[in-house]
Design a protein with these regions (language model features):
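Alpha-helical structural elements of signaling/regulatory helical domains
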Residues: 15-19, 36
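A short, surface-exposed loop/turn module that caps and links secondary-structure elements
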Residues: 29-54
Length: 84
């Protein structure tokens, strides 16, 4: 699966070496199988109903959406409390 990153996403991940390392590991897994059960990929509801989320680790999440041509655009990354 092809992915792209919003400018806000790039800013959030830049400068956090630990989070960035975890992210690149999960990105490889996501591009191979976006709905792998270990990622816990799920559709959001409420004010974020247009977005999806998957887990980087116990507390860190990535928010993204699918485009019409089946690409994923990552829009936010952070702790559960930061992104929801």
């Amino acid at each position: 699966m092809e992915v792209s990153f919003s400018s806000a996403f790039k800013k959030r991940i830049k400068g956090n070496a630990d989070l960035e390392m975890k992210f690149w590991q999960k990105l490889e897994q996501f591009t191979a199988a976006p709905f792998d059960p270990s990622l816990k990929t799920h559709k959001l509801s409420g004010k974020l109903k247009e977005l999806w989320s998957f887990s980087v680790d116990y507390d860190e999440r990535i928010l993204f959406y699918f485009t019409e041509d089946e690409k994923a655009v990552f829009v936010d990354i952070g702790s559960h409390d930061e992104v929801y």
